[in-house]
Amino acid sequence: MTIDFVTLLHQSDSLLLFVVLAFGLLLGKVRFGNFQIGNTIGVLFTALLFGQMGFEFTATTENVGFMLFIFCVGIEAGPHFFSVFLRDGIHYITLTLVILLTALFLTVGLAKFFNLGPGMAAGILAGSLTSTPALVGAQDALRSGLLNLPHQTDMQSVLDNMGIGYALTYLVGLVGLMLVVRYLPSLARLDLNTEAQKIARERGLSDNESRKTYLPIIRAYRVGPELAAWIGGRTLRETGIYPHTGCYVERIRRNGILASPDGDAVIQEGDEIALVGYPESHEKLDVNYRNGKEVFDRNLLDLQIVTEEIVVKNDAVVGRHLVELNLTEKGCFLNRVVRSQIEMPFDRNIMLQKGDVLQISGEKQRVKLLANKIGFISIHSQTTDLVAFTTFFVLGLLIGSVSLVFGQLEFGLGNAVGLLLAGILMGYLRANHPTVGYVPPGALRLAKDLGLAVFMVSTGLKAGGGILDHLSQVGAVVLFSGMLVTTLPVLVGYLFGVWVLKMNPALLLGAITGARTCAPAMDVVNEAANSSIPALGYAGTYAVANVMLTLAGSFIIGFWF
């Protein structure tokens, strides 16, 4: 039996889809030094190659792909989209607007100057900014009929131009941004590490390398005369045992009676105390503690130490500084703070926002009490709330279908913006109500990445058939335009941030990469600064940038026509 694999690919959209995905994702694993091609570039380039070989994708799967992707982008942005307007929020929003508007008008100007075909500007904008949401917004604005095409303008040719412009400039945008943020501090004669340390001193920050990646442990000691004399009748609060030892007193046994002490308790000679702390804290205990005998008492040591992820929700703590929680007095250890999927540097003055995730270790009941005070413990479940997911998805489609009429002008949001807004609402509600709209991080990442990959396959296959002709005709112009749109808005944003907003350069470069929603570039800034502090700036702009970039895709189509 003979199997014609090429014929099978031509006859089966499903087989073609997953063959391109498999080869593209494999290509995305290729590394050149510290640079990895990545899934988006790998799938897009593979799809372009298959498209050039004559393969076509006629299924409607593309629509499902881009809708899943943009909806998941909204869910990710939702918890912090509104809270970004708090501390430094106006700076981050203004910076994002400056970068985006500069890129938008520059792209339109270049497209008009070089007389590029309809749709090419949208592709150049999305590719140069490495923003798939911008491409999704542009294509959806065209497909949904929000804009009336000029006479004799073929929609498919406009869509193909978008895909080709995006494909030609995406790699330029990614590598270009990484190079700019890497060498801009040197050109500006700045030591990024010094600037990062300056912020660290001002805000009491520490880097991730100093954090504990393991649980605290429990050990028990009998209070000897030396320790009792040092305490001298002072309460636990007055003694400050945690600052002195790095451990806190979880239990006391006195005259055979077990008790959980509060800050007003006084330790006496002969007491047996259970101390909770990291192993090195026990090793470095003052000699006063070691003069007493270590105790191995099952009841005294029978404590359950847990690590939980607590989602910040309660208005009483939102907007307050982390240090105000007095975690150590509550017998809790902070392992990390995550915001917008980015692990933040330790900043005792960081202002808490709804949706922040605090990873806390400590005795189970203490951690539970803390969670009740500041929010809720993230659900330990691998089950997606599909009822909420599908309901908000439908809501997004309904929002996108609404049109407003102003005289002869009809305006609608389209599916992309509608789904993005519905996703933001679902993510925001999830940050405030633990039982609504839960999607496990792995499931959300799968839906987002798979939706993006399917969209890239469709875009690449459709654009691939004419990419060689476009390369010979306008390839150099498109690549040159992509270089300008990649670099100039970043330079304008940097100068605006330094001269007008007076931002610290380390935070500013992190914010610029967030405004471009480019995590690989943020890693470059972190490496140059030898610090994770730029992540503070990245998290400040990332959520709002995703929304603005989607809208920009729709707007640039409007500018062109």
From Swiss-Prot:
SUPFAM superfamilies: TrkA C-terminal domain-like. It comes from Aeromonas hydrophila subsp. hydrophila (strain ATCC 7966 / DSM 30187 / BCRC 13018 / CCUG 14551 / JCM 1027 / KCTC 2358 / NCIMB 9240 / NCTC 8049). Gene3D superfamilies: Regulator of K+ conductance, C-terminal domain. Belongs to the AAE transporter (TC 2.A.81) family. YbjL subfamily. GO terms for molecular function: monoatomic cation transmembrane transporter activity. The chain crosses the membrane at residues 8-28, 37-57, 66-86, 90-110, 161-181, 386-406, 409-429, 450-470, 476-496, 541-561. InterPro entries: AAE_transporter, RCK_C, RCK_C_sf, Transp_YbjL_put, YidE_YbjL. Its main location: membrane. Residues 206-291, 293-376 form the RCK C-terminal domain. Keywords: Cell membrane, Membrane, Repeat, Transmembrane, Transmembrane helix, Transport. One of its GO terms (cellular component) is plasma membrane. It is found in: Cell membrane. This is Putative transport protein AHA_2450. One of its GO terms (biological process) is potassium ion transport. Pfam families: Asp-Al_Ex, TrkA_C. It is a multi-pass membrane protein.
